[in-house]
Every structure is written in C-alpha cells, then in structure tokens.
UniProtKB/Swiss-Prot annotation:
PANTHER family: PTHR43509, SULFATE ADENYLYLTRANSFERASE. Keywords: ATP-binding, Nucleotide-binding, Nucleotidyltransferase, Transferase. Belongs to the sulfate adenylyltransferase family. This is Sulfate adenylyltransferase. The keyword ATP-binding applies. InterPro entries: ATP-Sase_PUA-like_dom, PUA-like_sf, Rossmann-like_a/b/a_fold, SO4_adenylyltransferase_pro, Sulfurylase_cat_dom, Sulphate_adenylyltransferase. Pathway: Sulfur metabolism; hydrogen sulfide biosynthesis; sulfite from sulfate: step 1/3.
Length: 378
C-alpha cells in the first residue's frame, strides 16, 4: 500500500490483454470503483479488497496495515463465475461488451453479508438502499490488484470529470493552499450555501464535488443537479474561489462510515478540509443527526490527513431575516424555516415552488424544468 498522500496511478491503456481469456462482468458500482481505484481516488488502495483487508475494514474501519479506511471496496461475482477462477490468475474486467481493466486475483472468498450490513450500514433492513444493494449483488468476493486498461468514453459530464491528479493541479494553479471539499447528491439549497460560504471564509477555495454515480431512484437526476450547480455558481459565488468537478462514485448511504470515506477520497483530490453537516450520507432515520460527525472522534487529523469541519443544522430565521444555525441564532423553532433536499424534492414533485428562503430562484427554475422533462420521459 502507498503512503498517505501519494496518489496511486493504475491506468495503463497500453497494457497487453490479448492473452487473457477469462473475464468478470462488472456492475455499475464496480465499474465506478475500478476507475476511482486506478486514478488514485481511493488511494492507498491498489485493488479490490482481499479477505484480510475486507475483514479489517468491516470490523475496525482500518486496512490490515492500520491505515484508516471505512467502506469495503469489493468485487462481487456469482458462485458460478467464482468456480471458474483461481488465485494468481489475471482476469479481464468487462462491462457492456468493453474490457476496462484486469485484476490479478489474490483472493476469492465468501463474505458474511449480514455482518457487513450490520457493521457498515448499522442495519440489516432491506428497505435501506445500501443494504438492499449489498444483498442484490453476487455472493462471492474477488480481491486483487487492478489495472485500468481503457478510460470511459461516455462520461456524461466530460468537462467536469477530473482525476485527482488534475484537481490537485488545478488547486495549485489557483494558488490555493487550503481547500474545503463539499460532497452532495442534492441540488444546493440555501442551508448548503450558508455552510459552504461560512467554510469559504476560513480557507482559500471551495471544491464542490457532487456525486454522480448510482443513487436511489427518487434522488434528483445528475444532469439536472449539474445544471443547478452551474447557475448557482454563476450567480452567487466568487468564480475564483470555487471549483466544480464530479465524483463518479456510487452512493452507499452508509452515514457515518461514508462520511469518513468521503473525507479520505477528497483528501486524494487535493482537499485540506472537508465539510461534514447534519446526517451526512444518511437515509431515512437509520442514523442519528450528528453521528457522522461523532465518528471522527475515533481518528486523529494526522491519520486522516484531512481536517473535518463540522456544521450544525442551519435554517432561515424569520426574526433574524437571515440564514443561521443554533450556534448563531437565539430564536425558537417557530421562527425557523428548516430546509432540506428532501423537502425541496417533495415540493417540486408536487408542483409547488419552493420559497426563496429555501432555494435561489435560478436553481428552482432549473429543477422545475428538469423534473418536467423527467415526467415526460417516464
């Protein structure tokens, strides 16, 4: 495994795959993981986890060598495929008829999925989207080092699809010594804007890094969200202090563990700080409001290599006539307009226009147009 801030680079488009016969089919999650492993987004990982690292991550939130890592990055295959594979073999990694990489098989093992669900997602409830996906995927895991032999050609947002080495370069070019990362799978509403701008007061740059991999079906589609980020940045943010680029990973909905994972990945993209808000990467009522912040107390900033910035729940206060949080506003709940991505989605789907205290009008216009289009194509 590489050292903390060294980026792994496992992209080799000249790699000779002509003699490799066997192949493993990748689902969309494994495909996006393959890319992030190869481009260094998941440094220090150099491949899909073998049994030792897998067990260690599930049980201790660390790799076998002690490095912090909180989400198991695994390659599931069916029992039938597993029977045809053996340790030491090189196997092609395929999706949609294209070979995207190879794996040097080091390990083939059957995980205890119930244990993985319980420890990673804190529930075995199949109504939880992460658990549902875990149980739907095949039941044998293949571990081993990978090489990415073909870059994806159909990235939906090519101009915003940058590798960690490119975002690091971009921050350097802009002279940013300190950069705060913000992870989102929702359109940015006023509470997010308030938090981002509060963080921007103490660092050189903001890295807005929306997740555009697989999400649950009622999340707003990535293309609509991207347009909403563009109009927001154009109209309400200083252009030289913000950089927008996509995070092509799938959403795990693993709450606290995913908050650690999101921070580690943003460190690889070049961030020095990472925003952790209310119920980060949560879903439903599976996690406590500030559980994703509390989990960080188990690790030192040195071993994480990135500084988490914790924010209270923010809201619009009708008495203050401004965005605020419980840290800055003395008024009661009756004066607070609570904003959330879920609430915005709900209003829009019911044909209601969120008030300007919720979302900027330009953003609302993009969302309404996008959701109308979605309804037409359904």
């Amino acid at each position: 495994m590489s050292t903390v801030n060294e980026l792994v680079n496992l992209v080799d488009e000249t790699y000779d795959i002509s003699q490799i016969e066997k192949e493993i089919g990748l689902d969309n999650i494994a495909l996006s993981d393959l890319e992030l492993l190869a481009t260094g987004g998941y440094s220090p990982l150099t491949g899909f986890l073998g049994k030792k690292d897998y067990d260690s991550v599930v049980e201790t939130l660390r790799l076998d060598n002690g490095s912090v890592w909180s989400i198991p990055i695994t390659l599931p295959v069916t029992e039938e495929v597993a029977k045809s594979l053996k340790s030491g073999e090189e196997v092609k990694l395929v999706n949609g008829g294209n070979v995207y990489g190879v794996i040097q098989i080091e390990d083939i093992f059957v995980p205890d999925k119930e244990k993985e669900a319980l420890l990673v997602y804190k529930t075995t409830d199949e109504a939880h989207p992460g658990v549902k996906k875990l149980y739907e995927r095949p039941n044998v895991y293949v571990g081993g080092a990978i090489v990415l032999t073909k870059r994806f050609e159909n990235n939906p947002f090519p101009s915003y699809h940058l590798d960690p080495i490119e975002t690091r370069e971009e921050f350097k070019k802009r002279g940013w010594k300190t950069v705060v990362g913000f992870q989102t799978r929702n359109p940015v509403h006023r509470a997010h804007e308030y938090i981002q701008k509060s963080a921007l007061e103490i660092v050189d740059g903001l890295f807005l890094n929306p997740l555009v991999g697989e999400t649950k079906s009622d999340d707003i589609p990535a293309d609509v969200r991207m347009e909403s980020y563009e109009v927001l940045l154009q109209n309400y943010y200083p252009k030289d202090r913000v950089f927008l680029s996509v995070f092509p990973a799938a959403m795990r909905y693993a709450g606290p563990r995913e908050a650690i994972f999101h921070a580690l990945v943003r460190k690889n993209f070049g961030c020095t700080h990472f925003i952790v808000g209310r119920d980060h990467a949560g879903v439903g009522d599976y996690y406590g409001t500030y559980e994703a912040q509390e989990i960080f107390t188990n690790f030192t900033v040195e071993e994480l290599g990135i500084t988490p910035l914790f924010f209270e729940h923010s809201f619009y206060c009708t008495k203050c006539e401004a965005m605020a949080s419980t840290k800055t506003c003395p008024h009661g709940k009756e004066d607070h307009v609570i904003l959330s991505g879920t609430k915005v989605r709900e209003l829009l789907r019911n044909g209601e226009i969120p008030p300007s205290t919720f979302s900027r009008k330009e953003v609302v216009e993009v969302l309404i147009k996008g959701l109308k289009k979605e309804v037409v194509t359904e």
